[in-house]
Regions:
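N-terminal nucleophile
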Residues: 1-214
Length: 214
């Protein structure tokens, strides 16, 4: 499902969703269901975020973190021991481990958001005022020092490659070519805003940048 389609679903019914793979060194099996299907099922369904999270057959999927929400509630769940949990107002930075994990990239991103983006939003919440700063942060390729790398069951070189907010294009895996096969492909900012003159109505805006070098 494209970012534009996701924004359209929010405009229609106030629903949004994102899924991340859970990195623990366990290879996905061919008979497991697509994790991306969880996003489509929620966006096109009618269950509340919490009810949807509770009815997922967790064992049917490879490891994932799923964040789903509507205008009233947001919930995170994974199939690595994290039960469906409401997300209340605040700043959340989630990567490919447990939601509460403090990886270098999540704390680096959190710090830059607090210092460079949140002050801009406080001045003027219109997306055009602060989105450029946010995209600049999402493009940060600073890698973690060796002593701050998480241990997720992959090789050291891979762990370091994955440790930055923006993952630079690289030839990854068993490949005969030097052409990049892995890296950050899309950066998206979804903004949900309550309109003062429209009662309880919200508007959704999504802006994405695509990278086609791999």
């Amino acid at each position: 499902m494209s970012p534009a389609q996701s924004a359209e679903y929010y405009e229609q019914n106030g629903r949004w969703a994102a899924v991340l793979n859970f990195r623990d060194g366990v290879q996905a099996s061919s008979d497991e269901r697509s994790r991306g299907g969880l996003v489509t099922e929620f966006l096109t369904g009618t269950l509340s975020p919490m009810d949807f999270a509770r009815q997922i057959d967790l064992q049917d999927y490879a490891g994932f973190n799923l964040i789903i929400g509507d205008a009233a509630q947001a919930v995170i769940v994974n199939n690595r021991g994290h039960a469906p949990t409401p997300l209340y107002s605040g700043l959340y930075v989630i990567s490919n481990g447990q939601p509460e994990d403090s990886w270098f990239k999540t704390e680096w991103l959190r710090g830059r958001l607090r210092q460079e983006v949140l002050p801009l939003i406080a001045e003027d919440s219109s997306p055009a005022y602060w989105q450029a700063a946010a995209f600049n942060i999402l493009s940060d390729s600073t890698k973690a020092p060796e002593d701050k790398l998480p241990m997720t069951g992959v090789a050291f070189e891979v762990e370091q490659m994955l440790s930055s907010v923006y993952i630079e294009p690289v030839a990854f895996g068993d490949t005969k070519t030097s052409k990049p096969t892995y890296g950050t492909r899309t950066q998206s900012i979804l903004t949900l805003r309550k309109e003062r003159d429209m009662g309880a109505n919200y508007t959704a805006d999504i802006v994405s940048r695509e990278f086609d070098s791999h």
